[in-house]
């Protein structure tokens, strides 16, 4: 859904629970 994680995932992983990597940023559904 809305990309409100405020995290980047240039190495391919996200630390924020519920967020997935949509390179180069983390997003929620």
UniProtKB/Swiss-Prot annotation:
PTM note says: This is a cyclic peptide.
- Tell me where the signal peptide lies: none
Question: What is the role of this chain?
Answer: Probably participates in a plant defense mechanism (Potential). Binds to and induces leakage in phospholipd membranes, particularly ones containing 1-palmitoyl-2-oleophosphatidylethanolamine (POPE).
The family assignment reads: Belongs to the cyclotide family. Moebius subfamily.
Q: Which cysteine residues pair off into disulfide bonds?
A: 5-19, 9-21, 14-26
> Which PROSITE patterns does the entry mention?
CYCLOTIDE, CYCLOTIDE_MOEBIUS
State the organism of origin.
Answer: Melicytus chathamicus
The protein here is known as: Cyclotide mech-7
Q: Where are the transmembrane segments?
A: none
Q: What is known of its domains?
A: The presence of a 'disulfide through disulfide knot' structurally defines this protein as a knottin.
Enumerate the Gene Ontology biological process terms.
Answer: defense response
Q: Where do we see the Cyclopeptide (Gly-Asp) cross-link in this protein? A: 1-29
- Per its UniProt record, what Pfam families does this chain match? Cyclotide
């Amino acid at each position: 859904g809305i990309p409100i994680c405020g995290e980047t995932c240039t190495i391919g992983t996200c630390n924020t629970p519920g967020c997935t990597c949509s390179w180069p940023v983390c997003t929620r559904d």
